[in-house]
Structure formats: C-alpha cells, structure tokens
C-alpha cells in the first residue's frame, strides 16, 4: 500500500485540528469556571467591606480606613494574615475529620453558584432541577460543621456542631416548602425559567408580590441557614466561645469565615432570583429583552449589574438585622422553626397549589 505525501499532510492536519479542538474545549470549560470563582471572591471581599462600614455606621465609629482607600483592602490583609498563621491541631482530636470539615463546608457552598443565572442565560449550568440541586448541596455544609465539632475533641466545639445540624434541619424544611411554592407558580425548577416567568408581568409579576408570606419565611430561613444574628447559636461567644471554630487557627479558621460569607451571598442571590425578578429591570416602557436583542454584550452587562444591585440590597438588610435584633435562645430558635415557620410555609404551599388548580 502506497501513501502519498498529500495524504500524509491531510492526516497530519486532521490530527492537529483534533488536538486544537480538544484544547479549545478545555479552555471553554475552565474560563467560565475561573471567571465565576474570581467574581465570587470579589463579591465576598465587597461583602466584608460593606458589613464593616455599615456596622461602623450603626455603632457610630469610623471602621477600617488604613488598608487601602476607605479600608477596602482590609479583608485582603486579614486573609493574608490568617494564611501565614500556624495551623494548630488538637492532640487528642480526630485529625482527618478536623482537617476535612472546613473544606466540605466551603466546597458544598461553592458548587451552589453553578446554577445562579447572573444575566439572560448567563449561567454555568442551566439544569431542569437547578433550584433543588442548590437545596441538596447546601444540606451538605452542616455535615462539615458537625465533623469539625466532633473532630476537635472539645465540648464547646461539639455542642456548636450539634447546634449547627439541628438549626439546619429545622429551617431547611420551611425553605424547601417556599421553593416548592415558587416552582408551582413558574411550572419549573430551573432558575432561568423562574426569572423568565416573573419577567412576563413586569414589576408586579415579581414573586415578592405573589408570595409575600413565602418571601418573609424564605428570608428568615436563609438567615438561619447562614447562622447570622439573631440565629448565630452554633458560635455564640458568650456560651460556646466560638462553637465549632474554637480549636481552629490559621487558614482553616479563615475557611469558616469564607464559608459564612459565601453562604450569605448565595442566599441573597437566590432571594433575588426567586422573588425579585433576577436580572429584569422592570421599569415601565423599558424592556431588558429589547436591550439584549439590540446589543447582547451591553444587555448582559446591564443584567449582571441589576442582579448584583438587588443582591446587595438584600445583603444590606441582612447586615442591618445583625445589629438590630438580639440573639434567640436555642428553644426559641427551634420553636420558631417547627411551630411557626413550618406550619405557615405548609399552608402557603397548599394555598398556592389550590390557586394553581383553580386556574387550570
């Protein structure tokens, strides 16, 4: 069999083309992921700076001002300091559980960002069960906290881990029932479909007006899931020193703070998507879809800006709540979840189902 030079060149060019396609495929996989992670890190740094400035304003003090202009680099300086601190481990603790606990908490929350639509179809994974994927993944984080508390071999850490697990279970159910009500109104579990269902009717089509009870329950439950005041029982300083974080130092201690702010940001994003219309601007006579059709790049940028503006508005409310309400006792926390929020959210789901059946 004789192979001519032209055939050899054709085969070589085909092999090179296949190799280039594989390289481009890998690039298109990693570039969106890298961009999302970079955006998340920036968002967390902004939240830390915003919380410190709002807290300083409420307490009538100055706040951070030396690290960068207006103290904007203070969070970066604190993270660098924790990075170089010694990583201490309890001598009689369970080292594998102690080491892997913070990583599980952070990774489980990071995976939830894959179903967040920041603009019109600007989402890493547009899944048909996107909203349920978030609920399933977010329920893994308390397991990491419980592992950290148990692996520390410290009574305060163990009690903090148990409190975190009990609190998560108590408020996960009302939150899930509120999400079910939203999915019934939108006839979908996709986060993109939920936003588009709200855009059909403009400002008054937001689920905030169609589900006001669900919005309040979802907001309270998300604050409890984030362990923010008045729901910070797992790390109550007066009772448990620092809860499940007591024995941690260095970068592992910093990972818990990162997980806390990541959880706060993801909760605010889901409030925006489920109840505040997502990327829709909802101004009369101005349709964001028309902007997308005329200039997709400009429309996508505007959509991201609108989503983040609504998200940070929700974050300001969460931060202000921290310095407004006192901490609940553990029995009050569980009673609120099981005796009030759960029955009300179940009744809200039944009412939503009834209205949807009557409208058929």
From Swiss-Prot:
One of its GO terms (biological process) is photosynthesis, light reaction. It catalyses: a plastoquinone + NADH + (n+1) H(+)(in) = a plastoquinol + NAD(+) + n H(+)(out); a plastoquinone + NADPH + (n+1) H(+)(in) = a plastoquinol + NADP(+) + n H(+)(out). It comes from the Eukaryota. It is found in: Plastid, Chloroplast thylakoid membrane. GO terms for molecular function: NADH dehydrogenase activity; oxidoreductase activity, acting on NAD(P)H, quinone or similar compound as acceptor; quinone binding. PROSITE patterns: COMPLEX1_ND1_1, COMPLEX1_ND1_2. The chain crosses the membrane at residues 27-47, 98-118, 129-149, 165-185, 203-223, 253-273, 297-317, 340-360. The keyword Thylakoid applies. GO terms for cellular component: chloroplast thylakoid membrane. Signal peptide: none annotated. Its EC number is 7.1.1.-. Its main location: plastid. Keywords: Chloroplast, Membrane, NAD, NADP, Plastid, Plastoquinone, Quinone, Thylakoid, Translocase, Transmembrane, Transmembrane helix. It is a multi-pass membrane protein. HAMAP family: NDH1_NuoH. NDH is composed of at least 16 different subunits, 5 of which are encoded in the nucleus. NDH shuttles electrons from NAD(P)H:plastoquinone, via FMN and iron-sulfur (Fe-S) centers, to quinones in the photosynthetic chain and possibly in a chloroplast respiratory chain. The immediate electron acceptor for the enzyme in this species is believed to be plastoquinone. Couples the redox reaction to proton translocation, and thus conserves the redox energy in a proton gradient. Belongs to the complex I subunit 1 family. This is NAD(P)H-quinone oxidoreductase subunit 1, chloroplastic. It comes from Draba nemorosa (Woodland whitlowgrass).
């Amino acid at each position: 069999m004789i192979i001519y030079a032209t055939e050899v060149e054709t085969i070589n060019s085909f092999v090179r083309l296949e190799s280039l396609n594989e390289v481009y495929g890998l690039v298109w996989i990693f570039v969106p992921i890298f961009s999302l992670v970079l955006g998340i890190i920036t968002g967390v740094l902004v939240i830390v700076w915003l919380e410190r400035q709002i807290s300083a304003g409420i307490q009538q003090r100055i706040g951070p001002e030396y690290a960068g202009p207006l103290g904007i680099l203070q969070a970066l300086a604190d993270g660098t300091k924790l990075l170089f601190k010694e990583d201490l481990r309890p001598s009689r603790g369970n080292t594998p559980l102690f080491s892997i606990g913070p990583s599980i908490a952070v990774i489980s929350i990071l995976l939830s960002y894959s179903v967040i639509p920041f603009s019109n179809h600007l989402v890493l994974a547009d899944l048909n069960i996107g909203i349920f994927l978030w609920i399933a993944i977010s329920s893994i984080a308390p397991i990491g906290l419980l592992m950290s508390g148990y692996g520390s071999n410290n009574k305060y850490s163990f009690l903090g881990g148990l409190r975190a697990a009990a609190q998560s279970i108590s408020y996960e159910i009302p939150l899930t029932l509120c999400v079910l009500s939203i999915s019934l109104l939108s006839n979908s579990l996709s986060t993109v479909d939920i936003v588009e269902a709200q855009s059909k009717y403009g400002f008054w089509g937001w689920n905030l007006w169609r589900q006001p009870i669900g919005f309040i329950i979802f907001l309270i439950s998300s604050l409890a899931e984030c362990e923010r005041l008045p729901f910070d029982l797992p790390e109550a300083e007066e009772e448990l020193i620092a809860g499940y974080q007591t024995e941690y130092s260095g970068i592992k201690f910093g990972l818990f703070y990162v997980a806390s702010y990541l959880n706060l940001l993801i909760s605010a994003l889901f409030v925006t998507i489920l109840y505040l219309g997502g990327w829709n601007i909802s101004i009369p006579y101005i349709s964001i879809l028309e902007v997308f059709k005329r200039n997709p790049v400009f429309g996508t940028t505007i959509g991201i800006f609108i989503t983040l503006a609504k998200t940070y508005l929700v974050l300001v409310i969460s931060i202000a709540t921290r310095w407004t309400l006192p901490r609940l006792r553990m029995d009050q926390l569980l009673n609120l979840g099981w005796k009030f929020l759960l029955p009300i959210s179940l009744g809200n789901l039944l009412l939503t189902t009834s209205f949807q059946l009557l409208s058929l």
